[in-house]
Amino acid sequence: MERHGVQHLVSFASHPSEAPVLAECMELANGRLSSLSVVDPRAEGAPERVRRLLDLGFSGVLLFPAMHGYRPDGPELADVLDVLEEDGAVALVHCGLLEVRLRDHFGIPRNYDLSLANPLHLILAADDHPRTHFVIPHFGAGMFRETLMAGTQCSNLYVDTSSSNSWIRTQTRALRLADVFERALGVFGSRRILFGTDSSVFPRGWRHDILVAQREALGACGLDGRGKNDILHGNAARLLGLEPRTDAPATTPTIESGTGRS
């Protein structure tokens, strides 16, 4: 983190057994690490588990509707969202294309129902839970138009910029990364976009190339310094309850996948 000028990062527990380890890491990180945990809301005792996670200092949950087989606005998730609402916590909801490389490495089939991962399914859930911060990673991972539509409807819905955004190849109209940022800014403004790289485990580590590409895209959009600071730092700091910085840094609290073991 020091070498790359990263002030704060977010990691996630991809299995319940990892949560205590991450809780200990947060204690040792002197306030520079926040954590989310993957939660399957269909699992027995899921709401109680979320309550324990929040009490341990977790900032919220990471949800995979396509992987676990439910709609975000369905009854399976309602009780979990009610717990998040109590604390105004974060629900990072993976929508669109889903690729988990470790699962691919072990030959686990990609039997994901992408119809369940439509950002439009978040609208009713977000409306019913106005204190919960819903974040769609990767600009919707191919469901970009739907992400923009959902963001237009819901003021508590955010988007993150993480990964190489290779989903752009799936769009019927050619898009540059700068085009993606420009359209996202038109809907979400600079206050509801969160920078991220989706950096993962070593040996790859920190994705400096993604930071460079996204800085260039923001520059091409003509965004002013305050807007850049919102995206690269301030918005994540606000959602995570961190102390805001006033020096408009060029580096950020990053939305990361820390374990990469979903």
Residue ranges and their predicted role:
Residues 3-8, 30-32, 127-134:
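Short, surface-exposed connector motifs at secondary-structure boundaries
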Residues 33-38, 157-162, 248-249:
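Short hydrophobic/aromatic-enriched beta-strand-loop microsegments
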Residues 11-20, 40-46, 68-73, 140-144, ...:
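Acidic-and-aromatic substrate-binding clefts and catalytic sites of carbohydrate-active enzymes
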Residues 60, 74-194:
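Catalytic pocket-lining loop regions of alpha/beta-barrel enzymes
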Residues 7-8, 15-104, 111-113:
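Active-site gating/metal-coordination segments in enzymes
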Residues 1-8, 183, 187-194, 203-262:
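Mid-to-C-terminal alpha-helical segments outside catalytic/metal-binding sites
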Residues 10-13, 38, 135-137, 160, ...:
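Short beta-strand segments
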